């Protein structure tokens, strides 16, 4: 049974390949500025953030290439599916993220798009560095060995 004290978070979109393709250094929660039809479309669960990334423009952080499809019940006031969306962060957080991206060769990758307990759309943003092919193979071997180890322990015990 679910605990009543746990916050109710509804995940709308998840970037599953991010943890495989990138070495994640740090995560930060950011708000996202959406229009009304975008919010309804995200609540419907049709949005994808798999090929998206965040970038800085004019001292702000923007989510680029996230696909939030048009809301079918909306009429002529619908939104553009792949438009850049502003991320809502404090100035200190923006400066920290921009510094990490410029100096250390990191990139900003969205991990999860969700609604928090107050119903606000949030984005879990990761400061990450791209993995090389041999790093991806190594993490895949570790994952396979963990699965195999679990199977062996279950078979014995």
UniProtKB/Swiss-Prot annotation:
Keywords: Cytoplasm, RNA-binding
Region spans: Disordered: 133-157
Keyword Thylakoid: no
GO terms under biological process: trans-translation
GO cellular component, one term: cytosol
Main location: cytoplasm
Biological role stated in the UniProt entry: Required for rescue of stalled ribosomes mediated by trans-translation. Binds to transfer-messenger RNA (tmRNA), required for stable association of tmRNA with ribosomes. tmRNA and SmpB together mimic tRNA shape, replacing the anticodon stem-loop with SmpB. tmRNA is encoded by the ssrA gene; the 2 termini fold to resemble tRNA(Ala) and it encodes a 'tag peptide', a short internal open reading frame. During trans-translation Ala-aminoacylated tmRNA acts like a tRNA, entering the A-site of stalled ribosomes, displacing the stalled mRNA.
Family: Belongs to the SmpB family.
Name assigned to this protein: SsrA-binding protein
Lineage, broadest ranks: Bacteria, Pseudomonadati, Pseudomonadota, Alphaproteobacteria, Hyphomicrobiales
């Amino acid at each position: 049974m679910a605990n009543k004290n746990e916050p109710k978070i509804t995940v709308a979109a998840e970037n599953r390949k991010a943890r495989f393709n990138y070495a994640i250094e740090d995560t930060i929660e950011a708000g996202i500025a959406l229009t009304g039809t975008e919010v309804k479309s995200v609540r419907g669960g049709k949005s994808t953030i798999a090929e998206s990334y965040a970038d800085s423009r004019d001292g702000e952080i923007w989510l680029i290439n996230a696909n939030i499809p048009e809301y079918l019940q909306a009429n002529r006031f619908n939104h553009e599916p792949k438009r850049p969306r502003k991320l809502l962060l404090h100035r200190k957080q923006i400066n920290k993220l921009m510094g990490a991206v410029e100096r250390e060769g990191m990139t900003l990758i969205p991990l999860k798009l969700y609604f928090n307990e107050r119903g606000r759309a949030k984005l879990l943003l990761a400061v990450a560095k791209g993995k090389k092919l041999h790093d991806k193979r190594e993490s895949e071997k570790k994952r396979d060995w963990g699965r195999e180890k679990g199977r062996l322990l279950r078979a014995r015990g």
